[in-house]
């Protein structure tokens, strides 16, 4: 009831009397509303904020509130009069209410049903709720309630259903929860609840549903849980619960779902779990469980989904699983399972998904698996399986995804494969398969990826593949395929990649190749193609990489190739091309790699080559180029990997402009006719690791830099006029050559020595001359690192930098006590990370990768490839937001490759966000971390030469130093963009929750995949939620965000509760702006996502608009990290 204040004069008595009458009337009507109605009005007026006026008929003129919106009443006692009606139900769900719940809620003592779900209510849950002792159902979910759960709920002895999920509640689950003896449903997931689960849960013997996932619970699951004999659903995923799974779970025989993924469980899976014969879903993935899979699981006759992946389970797959007749999905991937695949799995007639990849399985693939008529997805990759592909697979009518790569399979691929199966992904690469490509593999017109690389397949590409209109990528590298280039491929309008390298294709490249309009990758290296390049190649406007090296192609380069404006990599090396280079090559402004070596090109190098400012590697060795080296080559400011002009007919002086190439690491000018001095500007080549000037006519003194002074004589052979360094002294008075007078005849003995020595020298000289003549007639590979397409990618010449930090293996072993587990600070995708304090006191991080150096099996090089990937990537990078690599080495004692990194004292962003420390980071700190990571990633995408895709951006791969500055690390999957010699990562590139949606159907990783992953990291920083979400909420954070914005619009309720405690609108608006940037990064279509450079600009602009408010206090509020 409102209060009115009036001013009136004494003579206005009549007006005063009228007003007094109205006030009296209002008081009378308010007092006529019963007590429940008055409590409800207090809820509305002193708590709720009803912006949409949903509670418009709540007013005090009614006798009872029983007709109000959301209110239901029941009679109390035998009377049906209005005085006997009490409020028993209050349903205000989805009313768009905000504000708080007033303590007056405790006055509704007859309330049985309370539903305030799906609003924007904040504040604490009032402790007065305990007065509603008749409550049976209380739904407070999907609001923004904070604070702790009031202990007064123990008074609600009649409560059957209690739902507080999707709020911002903190603190423990109170021990008093055990007093709710009638409780059947307890739903508390997606909050910030902490501490151990209370033992009093064992008192809830009527409990059927307990869901408390996505909180910060720790400790063990109490053994008392075994007393909840009516429990049907146990969901505790995405917490920090540790210890062993209690065997008492096996007593809960009514359980239907056990959802415990992504915790810190260790130890064995208890055998007692086999007692759960009603269980339908068992999800234990993403933990640290060890030991064998219990055979007793085979007793769980109702099981439909069995997820044990991403653990450390070992032993064999129990054959008893064959008794699980209702199972539809089994995923045991990413474990340490060994032995053979049991044939008993073929008895699971309902099986639709079987993932066993990345284990240590051996033996053959049982042909009995062909009986699984419902099988749609089978992935047995990255194991040691042998024998043939079961012929029965060609009869699986539901098969869509068949991945068997990286095994040792042999025999012929079943020729009927695809005839009856709607295949969309087939990857058999890196095996020892033979025979022909199955002719019907695309019979159902669904195939998007066919990868048969690195096998022994022969014959032609069958017409069935050439007519496969759905095909996006055809990868048959490293086989024995024959025939001419299949012109029919260019009728496939969706085809983006043709990779036919290292086969036996022959004949000319047909002009029809120009009709492959969407082609981005055309790799034809190491075949027997001949004739000229067709002019029609110029029509491939989307072409990014073009590799025809190691063929027998002739003729000139068509000038029309300049129309391929998107070209980044052009490799024409090791052919028989002739003529001069077309000046139009200089208009390919995106070009990063140009390889023309070992051909018969002649004439001058066109000065327009200097326009290729993105070029990182220039290979022109072994040709007939003549004239002078154009000074415009000094404009190639991005040139980094190599400039190779060796074995040509260049003359004149070396242009001093070459000294402007500050990033250049290898320079080869040997075997030409160059004269004059080595320019003094070469002292500016600070990145140079090696160069070769041999067999020219150079004179004068070597540059005074250390690299020139320490070079061996072989780099300068055949240049009589050079001096300095290890050559002769430039001072004639200090000549190192003996004076002729000293060789005059002396004693007879001395004469004989001279004769013998002279004879030996003469013989050696003749031998050297013969060797030089041989190499002049047969030019060798230039000294700069240039990887042959047929050679393995794993070469010594691939190491582009020299270790500078003086750390020895002995220091590392002593600092880690021989790599003892107590020094482990993390486990990455490709290795284990140890903390090591060096004798100097410097703390470093040591990543240890098990090596496979002793084996020659092509399938055993994954870790070495990972080692090289990190070295090749990190060794060339210097950026404040990229983890610095100090050095690398190989430790023979443990057969391990070691990478020595800068140590990050605060660990990973993932640990800070999801390890119970997120409350320690305010928004300015999180924003600074986001901007730093973005700048590091933008450097990889736009400033590295060549550009780099990270492939595994996630919060655990963003490391934080003591000043809360972000450093992007873990380059185990890093890939130079469009570098065909890079290891083909056929397995999933990335981590669950961060993988861009297009990867599922293209199997292609682009910069836009990194941007999607970064968007997920932004969402983690903003929401505090993990990247993987419950399936009913979308399954991942990006989908959850889209759904939340769709259902509730973009408001601050989407943000981490720890962030919304601030009351500054500028900061809140800034967080909403960054959320919009995150949503933009996670757009479903790659073309809709910004570039990383654009992301950085958007973040900077958003911070500038927020102004000085975005200043972190975290660094001063938090104690420094513990000393090493």
Curated annotation (Swiss-Prot):
Residues spanning the signal sequence: 1-32
Keyword annotations of the record: ATP-binding, Glycoprotein, Kinase, Leucine-rich repeat, Membrane, Nucleotide-binding, Phosphoprotein, Receptor, Repeat, Serine/threonine-protein kinase, Signal, Transferase, Transmembrane, Transmembrane helix
Top enzyme class: transferase
Domain Protein kinase: residue ranges: 819-1100
Residue positions, PTM Phosphotyrosine: 901, 939, 994, 1001
CC annotations in GO: membrane
Protein's name in the database: Probable leucine-rich repeat receptor-like protein kinase At2g33170
